[in-house]
Amino acid sequence: MQQSESSSAQFDVAVIGSGPGGYEAALHAARHGMKVCLVEKASLGGVCVNWGCIPTKALLRSAEVYDLAKNPSEFGVNVSELSFDLAQAVKRSRKVSLKSSKGVEFMLKKAKVEVWRGEAVLTGSKGVKVTAEDGSERSLEAANIIVATGAQPRVIPGLEPDGKKIITSREALILKDVPESMIVVGGGAIGVEMAWFYAKAGAKVTIVELMPRLLPAEEAEVSEALKRSFEKVDITVQCGAKLGNVAISEFGVNADLLAEGKEPQKIEASCMLVAVGVTGVIDGLGLDAAGIETERGFIRTDELCRTSASGIYAIGDVRGGMLLAHKASAEAAIAVEAIAGKLPEPLSEPLIPRCVYAQPSVASVGLTEEAAIAAGYKVLVGRSQFAASGKANAYGQLEGFVKLVFNAETGKMLGGHLIGHDAVELIGELGLACRYGVTAEGLVGTVHAHPTLSETVREAAFAALQSKG
């Protein structure tokens, strides 16, 4: 039954979507004493908790444990009859996701955020209609609305997913069996992580990336190191290439591989994972009714996450830019502070850390050397290999390095780039250094615990100082 306009529930803030941006916005607004409603049509936590960050990392951990167990004798451990159980890995992954989702539910309840289940449609700049799964409807009005609906996999014409032969990252998280072979279209973060997981699980994997290298937004040296590492474990990497004709049969997928300056080549696999980016979840949201402008599949906003409609904000993936959960969380705080009448500091995208969780893992923050030079900086660069680290040697994980980029004139850090086992865990220090302009001397003068991988950061800073002559 449709409620009348006069019976609409009243809130200070309504949040549409419960991913890292949405639930953080709701919690932050509640801490400000605002009456908050959060609307979610699926599981609390959004894609990140249920079909993205969290379950992916759980699967990657399973593959990492399996990989370590395949070579245990060096560590004095004897293992026999080793095998990889994908069903159990998926089961654990789903359990981890469910626990995280329940955690979000607990936090919202504790903060007295009212959660409405259903599909939200904007009915104006202040109104939202929510349709529950059973078809029942109710309405709310809010002084401010935050749209945090996230994003969904981009579909390429001719590569429409069928959930079996052509899949997205969502299906890749719950496959029943390890495919004999897999073509991964896209060498970004999702493609790289899924390629590594399924290769370690036993599939023969080929990555096809249109750009000249894997992780094209990252430091070139890091991308090349990752490619070499992947090729050592028999992952075929085809960069500067695209797919031509794609055919599906009962046996799998075959396609023409097209690379500039090379003859077309036939490739085939049991299935194909398409991971070529995402587009904002905006269809059916009622953006026109609210007067909200979009651009290339995302909601257009200013630096404080304000849309073209007064009182409506957009945060996270639906806003575009870097598609990262922690960026969404940071934008949640910005939007709520703006609603509260504060003057929040706009987010600087270069200072947002980027992480890729294959092994070796990749992490970066700030400018690459190339970008810094292009921006007009004179740079000072320092590098240090993890192979020189006592901790890395003790763990038998020698791959990778740290590369730091400094402003040669001021000495302040401009960017930090890492590749190595669990290198992502070091990015916090580098993010802090970039944000506050820490110098190479400052990093060297900071005592780093021994033995830790973080000592490699200090050694890279020391190398930069030595290069000054």
From Swiss-Prot:
Highest taxon of the lineage: Bacteria
Subcellular location: Cytoplasm
Residues that coordinate or bind NAD(+): 186-190, 209, 275-278
Residues involved in FAD binding: 40-48, 57, 120, 317, 325
Matches recorded under Gene3D superfamilies: 3.30.390.30, FAD/NAD(P)-binding domain
One Pfam family per UniProt: Pyr_redox_dim
Cofactor(s) in the UniProt record: FAD
Miscellaneous section: The active site is a redox-active disulfide bond.
Family: Belongs to the class-I pyridine nucleotide-disulfide oxidoreductase family.
The protein, known as: Dihydrolipoyl dehydrogenase
Species of provenance: Chlorobaculum parvum (strain DSM 263 / NCIMB 8327)
